[in-house]
Amino acid sequence: IIVLGEIRDRITAETAIQAALTGHKVYSTFHTEDTIGGLLRLIDMQIETFLISSTVISVAAQRLLRRICTLCTAPYAPAQVEVERVGLRIEDVRDLELKKGRGCKTCNYTGYFGRIAVYELLILNEDVKEAILAKRPAHVIRRISTETTGLVSMREDGIAKVIRGFTTFEEVLSQTPRTFETRPLRQILQMTQ
């Protein structure tokens, strides 16, 4: 196992690829918007697509969102515009009891205390590898990943965490990229169990 610091340049990327080609598991980091951005960053560094598709197994992305303060949490009904901005319909959440922090001494009257991570994990199956080899655009790779691997976006993971009472739509909107259309809430909740 080889753990590299952040891959910032072509030399480091080539080193990681060469190590992977010789059978080593290589773990590293990128600063990108999402999982597809990690693949595109390698392509931008002029790493050949056949090397990317033959060595990369998966790409993970994460963001930290503020967590609702458990000491001052209270039920609330979100505004329709707030729900629509995350890609849901108001009917999806009308009968749910969502939570929001009122603000207290513990959370410095913000309504939030601590952090919670939202994740996105892209597993490179054959369909995704073929899309990379064909140099398909990011939105096509994302669509293929969503359809064939069940890729859940960070935004969708965040929505599930709102429904489960950990954070708010406001946090999800401010901290996660909108990378594709949000699936129906029922499907998101099934995929994030």
Predicted regions and their residues:
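Short, flexible helix-loop junctions that flank or precede catalytic/ligand sites
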Residues: 1-193
